C-alpha cells in the first residue's frame, strides 16, 4: 500500500547522517550549525560547520586539521569575506540612520545644545522648524552686530 502522505526523502536523508547508525539521529535543527560538538556527523569533517551560506572555499569553518602551510590561515580569512551587501545594507539602512539621529538628539538634549526657540546662529533657523519669531530675529541681529564670527 502506498503512503497517504508523500515521504520527504530529502529530509529523511538529511536526518540520517552518515556518522551514526541511522536509528539514532538528531533532529535537523540541531545539525544546523553552532558550537563544535565532541562527535562529528562524519569523521572526516570538523563537528560544527555552517550550513547557511557557505561556499566551498570557506567550508571547513573551524580550520582544517591538515595545515597546508602558514599561508593557509591568511588565505582562509581573505576568502571568508562576505559579499559586501551583507555587511553594508545594515550600515546604511533607513532604520540605521534614524537610530543615529535619535541617539544624537538625545545626546544633544543632555548637553543642552539642542535647538531651542532662541538659536545662536541664523543658519539654524530652519532647524528650529522655521519659527522666525521677533525675539529670534532680534537675537540674530544682536549677534550679527557683535560680529562674533
From Swiss-Prot:
Residue ranges of the region described as Disordered: 1-41
Tissue and organ distribution: Testis specific.
Full protein name: Down syndrome critical region protein 9
